[in-house]
């Protein structure tokens, strides 16, 4: 395997070729940094968190594919993943995970002690998550915690503490993550049932759309509470309205429960997150 082929394999293993997950992690992290700073965050902290999000997203993908390597070959969407297809060995994948994990931890060491402690919890959660799909019908709810963990870390890095405002944002992102990852799970539901992978899409059954809607509404309420705690105004409110618009569109897409529209609904959440971040940033600027 030449260097170009090796890069292609690593890129697919870490999902660098599919940045949607990185973006969905990035928007709430950036929102947390802006809220914690009351505007423009410290540049050093901002750069560390942006790089950290990219690295930890890659780590999460590697450990997820390692855990699912014997199942992914039976699922239409995942059978071409490098570990499932045998393009890379488990030893090489785990080595890459360790290298990236150490790089991320090295970045964290540039910050304060509270962030370091929170980061240890974060890496443990990241490792545990992929295996929850075998023991619970609610892995998306565990993922919501994993994908929201950068929020208390961001507040800790910027202010040295984690105030109540941070936990409102944490709750908002948790509800939102469960909603959009259930849309994602709807894409694989038929295959997951065959191979025994558990998900909220299977758990919710015929009420999946309604429960996703409830989680979207709960996320909205918590985003409102986070903004209210930080005394945000009209432009943040416009961002929230745009979020509602995207959420409504996603409900339309998943109505028929077909694979392609459900995946499109999942991808659309990137724009919902961008709208929230732009609304928040504009509210501080203007």
Curated annotation (Swiss-Prot):
Single GO cellular component term: plasma membrane
Enzyme Commission numbers on file: 2.5.1.39
Keyword Ribonucleoprotein included in the entry's annotation: no
CDD domains associated with the record: PT_UbiA_COQ2 (cd13959)
Pathway annotation from the record: Cofactor biosynthesis; ubiquinone biosynthesis
Catalytic activity reported: all-trans-octaprenyl diphosphate + 4-hydroxybenzoate = 4-hydroxy-3-(all-trans-octaprenyl)benzoate + diphosphate
GO annotation terms (biological process): ubiquinone biosynthetic process
TM region positions: 21-40, 96-116, 142-162, 167-187, 210-230, 235-255, 266-286
InterPro entries the UniProt entry points to: HB_polyprenyltransferase-like (IPR006370), Prenyltransferase (IPR039653), UbiA_prenyltransferase (IPR000537), UbiA_prenylTrfase_CS (IPR030470), UbiA_sf (IPR044878)
Domain of life: Bacteria
Gene Ontology terms, MF aspect: 4-hydroxybenzoate polyprenyltransferase activity
Alphabetical list of Gene3D superfamilies matching this protein: UbiA prenyltransferase (1.20.120.1780)
Keyword DNA-binding: no
Enzyme class: transferase
Keywords noted in UniProt: Cell inner membrane, Cell membrane, Magnesium, Membrane, Transferase, Transmembrane, Transmembrane helix, Ubiquinone biosynthesis
Membrane topology listed for this record: Multi-pass membrane protein
Coiled-coil region list: none
Matching Pfam families: UbiA (PF01040)
Primary role: Catalyzes the prenylation of para-hydroxybenzoate (PHB) with an all-trans polyprenyl group. Mediates the second step in the final reaction sequence of ubiquinone-8 (UQ-8) biosynthesis, which is the condensation of the polyisoprenoid side chain with PHB, generating the first membrane-bound Q intermediate 3-octaprenyl-4-hydroxybenzoate.
Family: Belongs to the UbiA prenyltransferase family.
Name recorded for this polypeptide: 4-hydroxybenzoate octaprenyltransferase
Organism for this UniProt entry: Shewanella sp. (strain MR-4)
